């Protein structure tokens, strides 16, 4: 735990869960910046699933529940995980002293975009990015905001876009986590804000 905690903010931390990751292993996964899990046999849990009251179908430890709880960036087949992890590597620096990732591109940074201000958040970020490619994180969590890495003129940029809905606290947590990562690795951030404010309710107030 100590070594991984000390590495936080110095190098990007990745966790990949292919089978059972319980107790201490689940805590280690939660310390990572990016977490992935195989969606058939993968399980992520602090306590044995049968120790949780009402958890008859082992739902809490499965990929869908863990994605919705914000503990995973992506779940899929083994082949899909490999593709997704390689995509993450292509956008992100190796450490916090790495120069901003740049690559040669032919896409025009100054191209016109029709209907941009009426686009859904995810589509707007994709439209801005070189060749329309983005790498989205925590997609199933805090759905009032989209957090993704994109490229502008070959340089990796962090993108945050709100969806036009009132913000729930989960979306705020998601954006804050993303911003802290970008700050640690000197990644510039582009923000597209379209929201009427914050949801009303006890959870948001507390």
Task: List the predicted regions and their residue ranges.
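Short, well-ordered helical secondary-structure segments
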Residues: 24, 31-33, 137-139, 144-146, ...
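Conserved catalytic cores of soluble enzyme domains
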Residues: 1-97, 195-206
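Generic detector of short, locally flexible boundary/turn motifs and exposed helical patches
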Residues: 1-3, 38-41, 113-117, 121-127, ...
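Cleft-lining beta-strand/loop regions that shape enzyme active-site pockets
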Residues: 1-5, 14-16, 148-206
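Intrinsically disordered, low-complexity segments enriched in small/flexible residues
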Residues: 68, 79-169, 176
């Amino acid at each position: 735990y100590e070594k991984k905690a000390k590495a936080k903010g110095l190098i990007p931390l990745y966790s990949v869960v292919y089978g059972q990751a319980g107790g201490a292993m689940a805590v280690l996964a939660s310390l990572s910046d990016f977490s992935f899990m195989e969606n058939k046999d993968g399980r992520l849990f602090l306590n044995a699933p049968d120790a949780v009251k009402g958890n008859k179908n082992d739902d809490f430890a499965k990929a869908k529940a863990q994605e919705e709880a914000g503990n995973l960036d992506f779940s899929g087949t083994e082949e899909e995980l490999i593709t997704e992890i390689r995509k993450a590597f292509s956008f992100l620096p190796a450490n916090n002293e790495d120069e901003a990732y740049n690559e040669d591109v032919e896409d025009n940074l100054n191209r016109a975009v029709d209907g941009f201000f009426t686009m859904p958040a995810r589509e707007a970020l994709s439209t801005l990015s070189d060749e329309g490619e983005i790498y989205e994180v925590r997609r199933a969590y805090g759905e009032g905001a989209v957090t993704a890495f994109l490229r502008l003129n070959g340089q990796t940029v962090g993108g945050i876009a709100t969806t036009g809905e009132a913000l729930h606290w989960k979306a705020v947590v998601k954006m804050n986590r993303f911003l802290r990562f970008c700050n640690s690795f000197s990644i510039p951030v582009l923000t597209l804000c379209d929201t009427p404010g914050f949801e009303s309710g006890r959870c948001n107030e507390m």
